[in-house]
């Protein structure tokens, strides 16, 4: 049914082709022209860079001090062993950081299934080869650290963020946390009734087995939707800065002149001139005060000294005096 020319077509899931447990193809149509690439590229970038997962981050191998070495009885050099450990597909429940152990002796391959772990850990690819022992008396023992993270974090980036006193023999591994091994999308032509200018989005995805391909796409779409939520209700969500209101006058100016503890003679002279607050007093000049009956130079000097001890002086100019609180009194 033809809708309004301004109404966008809403895509629906057409088909999910499960090629294998780790490989699937998802087809979505119809999409308005151009939206195939818009959505496909956004989902592709999220699937490659932002999917959480678990990866080997550190390894300690008995008898090995650094990665640029070899171990007697082991066919591969240590760099190749570390590279093989990067291919370990691990699922960890309820934990973000676990340690696994591997002890193997005797001639033959050392595989992921030889790793010892607890019930919270699942090795998805137990047949994955880590190295080969070439002698009946050869053995290898290692402690493997697996952490949860997102995207790809090279060992060099983590080395700078960790303590410089990292023990000799603790080897850092480039961590590829993403469970997505490969993602590709293709945009094909689609048709709805008489419209032939529509898009069909085909996403082909492979994972390492720790996450179902369909679930991976679902999570990527959720991440994208959550990031776009801020644009749906577009407004400045920053908290406004609360400016501290400064009092219009120094609180000391609002205090009565009695708080100055002047002599009785000086205090009575000020009251006779209706000078009740310190703010009233500081606005008077020396000449004005000397005109006050019974207030001589001795009292004037006393008043000046008391005001100076409080950082005040005579002849001050106070705009908007008296404040409303005093005027009401």
Curated annotation (Swiss-Prot):
The gene is rpoA. GO terms for molecular function: DNA binding; DNA-directed RNA polymerase activity; protein dimerization activity. It is an enzyme of class 2 (transferase). It catalyses: RNA(n) + a ribonucleoside 5'-triphosphate = RNA(n+1) + diphosphate. Gene3D superfamilies: 5' to 3' exonuclease, C-terminal subdomain, DNA-directed RNA polymerase, insert domain, RNA polymerase, RBP11-like subunit. GO terms for cellular component: cytoplasm; DNA-directed RNA polymerase complex. Transmembrane segments: none annotated. Pfam families: RNA_pol_A_bac, RNA_pol_A_CTD, RNA_pol_L. Homodimer. The RNAP catalytic core consists of 2 alpha, 1 beta, 1 beta' and 1 omega subunit. When a sigma factor is associated with the core the holoenzyme is formed, which can initiate transcription. Belongs to the RNA polymerase alpha chain family. Its EC number is 2.7.7.6. Residues 1-235 are annotated as: Alpha N-terminal domain (alpha-NTD). The keyword Nucleotidyltransferase applies. It comes from Actinobacillus succinogenes (strain ATCC 55618 / DSM 22257 / CCUG 43843 / 130Z). GO terms for biological process: DNA-templated transcription. This is DNA-directed RNA polymerase subunit alpha. DNA-dependent RNA polymerase catalyzes the transcription of DNA into RNA using the four ribonucleoside triphosphates as substrates. Residues 249-329 are annotated as: Alpha C-terminal domain (alpha-CTD). Keywords: DNA-directed RNA polymerase, Nucleotidyltransferase, Transcription, Transferase.
């Amino acid at each position: 049914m033809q809708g309004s020319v301004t109404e966008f077509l809403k895509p629906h899931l057409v088909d999910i082709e499960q090629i294998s447990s780790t490989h699937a193809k998802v087809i979505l149509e119809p999409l308005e022209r151009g939206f195939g690439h818009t959505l496909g590229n956004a989902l592709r970038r999220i699937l490659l860079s932002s999917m959480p997962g678990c990866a080997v981050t550190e390894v300690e191998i008995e008898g090995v001090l650094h990665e640029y070495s070899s171990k007697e009885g082991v066919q591969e050099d240590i760099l190749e062993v570390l590279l093989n450990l990067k291919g370990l597909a691990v699922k960890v429940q309820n934990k973000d950081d676990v340690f696994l152990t591997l002890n193997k002796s005797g001639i033959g391959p050392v595989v992921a299934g030889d790793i010892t772990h607890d019930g919270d850990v699942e090795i998805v690819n137990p047949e994955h080869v880590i190295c080969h022992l070439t002698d009946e008396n050869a053995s290898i023992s290692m402690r493997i650290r697996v952490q949860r993270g997102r995207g790809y974090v090279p060992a060099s980036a983590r080395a700078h963020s960790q303590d410089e006193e990292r023990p000799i023999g603790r080897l850092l591994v480039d961590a590829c946390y993403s469970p997505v091994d490969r993602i590709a999308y293709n945009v094909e032509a689609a048709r709805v009734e008489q419209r032939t200018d529509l898009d069909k989005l085909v996403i082909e995805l492979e994972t390492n087995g720790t996450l179902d391909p369909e679930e991976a796409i679902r999570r990527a779409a959720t991440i994208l939707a959550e990031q776009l939520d801020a644009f749906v209700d577009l407004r400045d969500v920053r908290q406004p800065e609360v400016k501290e209101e400064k009092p219009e006058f120094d609180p000391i100016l609002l205090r009565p002149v009695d708080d100055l503890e002047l002599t009785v003679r000086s205090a009575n002279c000020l009251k006779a001139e209706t000078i009740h607050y310190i703010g009233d007093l500081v606005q008077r000049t020396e000449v004005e005060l000397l005109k006050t009956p019974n207030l001589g130079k001795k009292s004037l000097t006393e008043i000046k000294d008391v005001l100076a001890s409080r950082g005040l002086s005579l002849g001050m100019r106070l705009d908007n005096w008296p404040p409303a609180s005093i005027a009401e009194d």
